[in-house]
Amino acid sequence: MSNLNDKIYDVFIAGGGINGVGVARDAAGRGYSVCLCEMNDFASGTSSSSTKLIHGGLRYLEHYKFRLVQESLKEREILLNMAPHIIWPMRFILPHTKGMRPRWFLRLGLAIYDHLGYRKILPGTSNVNFANQKTNSPLKDTFKSGFEYSDCWVDDSRLVILNAVDAASKGASLRNYTKVTNATSSNGLW
């Protein structure tokens, strides 16, 4: 588009998924002039095909990524507070059998997950006894006990759009169906 060449932006972003619009929102909120181009519609790619989970990264505990888990749990709580209309708490059941890691080990991991989190809204982890489960349960009879923990579900496309709307309200120029085909440097500018 010819009018893109008429203005020099502080920040130019190619891609209108959650990362692109999130950066646009943050940069525009800090007073930078921002232009974002997306070759299709906003949230039309990976951002609308996610697992739809806002999770704390429970599996990263196994690799001792405590800081990453703590940061993820903190951000999960912030997002849940900011957008309860598109992010909902969700309880997960983790059945346990003897062939898995020791029960005490899993419980320890979940206790660490609780400890690292900044939970003010979500309930903590708990033990679950399936011995009294009703017939027609989706669980196999081999599952006698397990654990329950919380994470969140998000309307991922809506999260992208809300970030895009906020970025635009802060002055960002957002252009969907605008493909970036080339970028060159001239006099220290792109």
Where are these regions (language model features)?
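Dinucleotide-binding Rossmann-like beta1-alpha1 core, especially the glycine-rich loop
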Residues: 52-136
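Short amphipathic alpha-helical face segments that pack within enzyme cores
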Residues: 22, 55-56, 158, 162
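Glycine-rich FAD pyrophosphate-binding loop
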Residues: 28-48
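Short linear elements at protein peripheries
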Residues: 113-165
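Beta1/beta-strand and adjacent pyrophosphate-binding region of the FAD-binding site
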Residues: 4-19
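Helical element adjacent to the flavin cofactor pocket in flavoenzyme catalytic cores
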Residues: 147-190
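Gly/Ala-rich phosphate-binding loop of Rossmann-like dinucleotide-binding domains
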Residues: 24, 28, 166-168
